[in-house]
Every structure is written in structure tokens, then in C-alpha cells.
């Protein structure tokens, strides 16, 4: 089972589950924990191979790596804790996992908050993935990861976000990074399906105005989805919860409270 941490509220029955992206860990939510635990029950988890979710030697060779199995990891924790329904907050690739969870287990999802959401891969990102596939077994993964974070978050005000992600990525093993990287071959058809299907689950997209690779497709998706809305944060990059944490916290806490009432 994944490593997880819970923070229980003395009065609230509302659950909020945080899902980080590739290369990160539950530590990426360090600017959210204090504020959210004042209002809700909070579940933080480390995805497979990330943070303190280290696989056993047996599981390293036997685990299946696809979006459904990784999504099931999350559901396993939720079921173990007997959480019937939760609001889900994700960042970057974590938003893809949340969307997949909502597709497979809609009865478990109260609402979705998608920070730095990935809805479509543009030509630039596809080029990056192609470059990575060629060199993933040759170049140290941390070099590749640094390169990726700089392409996605190139501006000077994105520096803290880059540093946080690289710090967490140092905890990954090379083999784990390669397995997660292989997921890229599955993501395009999955995203295409997500764009075509409106789940009608309340969804708030929180995007930085400088999230150059992913913002355009999210804007189009919001126009097509009947229960979706977009918070656009100007002068902000991909990792909105780190770069503009106060605005992120204020808006998302209010959103979750509204969706819970």
C-alpha cells in the first residue's frame, strides 16, 4: 500500500485528498497542509515509487505500470481508510490520475481541483517526450528531470517550483523514473478520451497564466464541460500551489466548502 498521512478534523466530515505529480511527493503540498486541516479532513499520499512509497524488491519486478493500476493504488488507500467520498486536489500529472479515478469510480469523487492540469500534449511537449525516450537509459534521470522542469517552467519566478520538484525527484530511483516515463506512451489516447467525455463532476481548474504548454487546451476544455470553471492566475507558472499558495488556498478552500454544502 502507498505511504499516506491523514489529518483528522474534530468536526468536519469532509475529506480532501491531495495527489502530486510525477517526480514529486506529498511534500509538494507543504504550503497547503496547515490551511486545509483547519477546515477539512486531509489525506496526503505518495504515489508508487515516490516519497516514502518505496516498493519491495519483489514488487519492483512484478508491479504493472499503467494509469489504471496507479489509480487503483490511490483507491486502495481510500478504501482502507473507509472514506466513502472525497474532494480530490491534484497538480500536473496528478490531475490525470484524478480524472482517471473519476472515470472509474465516480461515486467516490465529490469534486476535482486540477492545478497545472494536463489535458493535451502540444508539439513541444511531444518533442520533449521523444527526446527523453531516446536518452532515458543513457543520461542520469535527474539531468533529464531538470531539463524538463526548465522547459515547462522557464521564467525566473518559477525558480522555487523547479527547486521543489528537483529536490523531491532526487528521492526517485533511476528504474522508477524510467517506468514512470514509459507511461507517456499511454497518456495521449487517455487524454483524448477525457477531452471527449464530460463527467459532470464539479471541477475547478487552477492554471498559471505562464503555464505555456498546458493552458491553451485547458481553456478549450472548460468551454466544453458543463460543470467546470477556470481560475487563471496571472504571472504564475505550472506549479500554482507553490508559486501562488495563498490565492490557491483561499480559492480552493472556499470551492471545496461550497461543493460540500
Where are these regions (language model features)?
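Catalytic active-site module of serine/aspartate enzymes centered on a nucleophile-bearing elbow/loop
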Residues: 228-261
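Conserved alpha/beta-hydrolase catalytic His-Asp/Glu region
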Residues: 123-125, 142-197
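Conserved loop-alpha-helix segment in the C-terminal half of the alpha/beta-hydrolase fold
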Residues: 202-236, 242
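Gly/Ala-rich beta-loop-alpha elbow adjacent to hydrolase catalytic centers
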Residues: 90-94, 98
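Conserved HGGG/HGGXW glycine-rich cap/lid loop of the alpha/beta-hydrolase fold
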Residues: 6-59
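Flexible "cap/lid" loop of the alpha/beta hydrolase fold
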Residues: 103, 109-139
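Alpha/beta-hydrolase fold catalytic core
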Residues: 1-17, 38-41, 79, 84, ...
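Active-site loop/oxyanion-hole signature of alpha/beta-hydrolase fold enzymes
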Residues: 34, 43-89, 250
Amino acid at each position: 500500500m502507498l505511504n499516506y498521512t491523514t489529518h483528522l478534523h474534530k468536526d468536519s466530515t469532509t475529506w480532501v485528498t491531495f495527489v502530486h505529480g510525477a517526480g514529486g511527493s506529498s511534500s509538494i503540498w507543504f504550503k497547503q497542509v496547515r490551511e486545509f486541516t483547519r477546515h477539512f479532513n486531509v489525506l496526503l499520499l505518495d504515489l508508487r515509487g515516490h516519497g516514502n512509497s518505496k516498493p519491495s524488491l519483489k514488487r519492483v519486478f512484478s508491479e504493472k505500470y499503467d494509469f489504471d493500476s496507479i489509480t487503483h493504488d490511490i483507491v486502495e488507500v481510500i478504501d482502507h481508510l473507509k472514506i466513502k467520498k472525497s474532494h480530490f486536489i491534484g497538480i500536473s500529472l496528478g490531475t490525470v490520475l484524478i480524472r482517471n479515478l473519476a472515470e472509474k469510480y465516480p461515486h467516490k469523487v465529490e469534486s476535482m481541483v486540477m492545478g497545472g492540469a494536463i489535458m493535451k500534449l502540444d508539439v513541444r511537449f511531444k518533442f520533449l517526450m521523444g527526446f527523453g525516450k531516446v536518452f532515458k537509459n543513457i543520461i542520469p534521470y535527474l539531468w533529464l528531470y531538470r531539463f524538463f522542469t526548465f522547459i515547462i517552467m522557464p521564467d525566473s519566478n518559477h525558480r522555487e517550483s523547479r527547486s521543489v520538484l528537483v529536490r523531491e525527484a532526487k528521492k526517485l530511483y533511476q528504474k522508477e523514473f524510467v517506468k514512470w516515463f514509459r507511461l507517456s506512451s499511454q497518456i495521449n489516447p487517455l487524454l483524448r478520451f477525457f477531452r471527449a467525455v464530460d463527467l459532470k463532476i464539479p471541477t475547478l481548474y487552477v492554471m498559471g497564466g505562464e503555464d505555456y504548454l498546458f493552458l491553451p487546451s485547458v481553456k478549450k476544455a472548460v468551454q466544453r464541460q458543463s460543470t467546470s470553471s477556470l481560475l487563471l492566475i496571472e504571472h504564475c507558472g505550472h506549479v500554482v500551489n507553490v508559486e501562488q499558495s495563498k490565492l490557491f488556498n483561499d480559492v480552493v478552500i472556499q470551492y471545496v466548502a461550497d461543493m460540500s454544502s
